[in-house]
From Swiss-Prot:
Enzyme's top EC category: oxidoreductase
Lineage, uppermost ranks: Bacteria, Pseudomonadati, Pseudomonadota, Gammaproteobacteria, Enterobacterales
Name of the protein described by the UniProt record: Quinate/shikimate dehydrogenase
Record-level GO BP terms: amino acid biosynthetic process; aromatic amino acid family biosynthetic process; chorismate biosynthetic process; shikimate metabolic process
The species this protein was found in: Escherichia coli O157:H7
Protein residues bound to NAD(+): 132-135, 155-158, 205, 232-235, 255
Catalytic activity: L-quinate + NAD(+) = 3-dehydroquinate + NADH + H(+); L-quinate + NADP(+) = 3-dehydroquinate + NADPH + H(+); shikimate + NADP(+) = 3-dehydroshikimate + NADPH + H(+); shikimate + NAD(+) = 3-dehydroshikimate + NADH + H(+)
Subunit structure: Homodimer.
Keywords: Amino-acid biosynthesis, Aromatic amino acid biosynthesis, NAD, NADP, Oxidoreductase
Signal peptide: none
Pfam family, one: Shikimate_dh_N
Annotated pathway: Metabolic intermediate biosynthesis; chorismate biosynthesis; chorismate from D-erythrose 4-phosphate and phosphoenolpyruvate: step 4/7
């Protein structure tokens, strides 16, 4: 790819960032489509995020992806949020239209799309959702919008717990889905929730390098064959949770599905063109 002065810049703002496959995936897609954009990753944490957004405007970047730990903070720095993004309280995509910034969240639509593509119908189902960060709440919000009956969200009593309660209130007030929030330390409640759940989704970074030997499921007997287990983490590809799930006879969806589908939607938001899905799946080794 020969980058010329006519090319526009798209970024990814996160910390840490070096593990991300998004730059490789998006640049392969842009090159295949013959579009004059290049995608670059920037190490940006909460402290440097405000300045980075000013830089985005000054450089007339087309937009940026937003990942941990900036997804919730980013809502404060855009001019407009989609209804779904308001429900989530976090964004992973910013589109810059001549200095007017729009915030979107494709994490939820991407993950739910991956579930649907596997042949699983979420309508009327119950999900146990681990975590209350930007990705997790995006998945919960989109699942609620698309027909989940109940979401049992588990999170430790950390800085995200109050945000989880606020998220649950927003979803309960605006959808037909019932969301409850429980401290993950309550292992009895966790076990009972899994016993009646249809889906278990890990929306935390537990399982991601350097936590690849960790899982929030301490007892594999809590997993049953009727449970669909899904991951947001894709590095490593096969997390400990997915290994546990397969040993227990569960159907699984790895983090590549969410990465692919949320990235496809981002691509279209930035470029106005269709994402070369089958090509990207092939060259990135994402499988069917």
């Amino acid at each position: 790819m020969d980058v010329t002065a006519k090319y526009e810049l798209i970024g990814l703002m996160a910390y840490p960032i070096r593990h991300s496959l998004s730059p490789e995936m998006q640049n392969k897609a842009l090159e295949k489509a013959g579009l004059p954009f290049t995608y670059m990753a920037f190490e940006v944490d909460n402290d440097s995020f405000p300045g980075a957004i000013e830089g985005l405007k000054a450089l007339k970047m087309r937009g940026t992806g937003v990942s941990m730990p900036n997804k919730q903070l980013a809502c404060e720095y855009v001019d407009e949020l989609t209804p779904a993004a308001k429900l989530v309280g976090a964004i992973n995509t910013i589109v810059n239209d001549d200095g007017y910034l729009r915030g979107y969240n494709t994490d939820g639509t991407g993950h739910i799309r991956a579930i649907k593509e596997s042949g699983f119908d979420i309508k009327g189902k119950t999900m146990v959702l681990l975590g209350a960060g930007g990705a997790s709440t995006a998945i919960g919000a989109q699942g609620a919008i698309e027909g989940l009956k109940e979401i049992k969200l588990f999170n430790r009593r950390d800085k995200f717990f109050d945000k989880a309660l606020a998220f649950a209130q927003r979803v309960n007030e605006n959808t037909d889905c019932v969301v409850t929030v429980t401290d993950l330390a309550d292992q009895q409640a966790f076990a009972e929730a899994l016993a009646s759940a249809d889906i278990l989704t890990n929306g935390t970074k537990v399982g991601m390098k350097p936590l690849e030997n960790k899982s929030l499921v301490n007892d594999i007997s809590l997993l049953h064959p009727g449970l669909l287990v899904t991951e947001c983490v894709y590095n490593p590809h096969m997390t400990k949770l997915l290994q546990q799930a397969q040993q227990a006879g569960c159907k699984t969806i790895d983090g590549y599905g969410m990465l692919l589908w949320q990235g496809a939607e981002q691509f279209t938001l930035w470029t106005g063109k269709d994402f070369p899905l089958e090509y990207v799946k092939q060259v990135m080794g994402f499988g069917a």
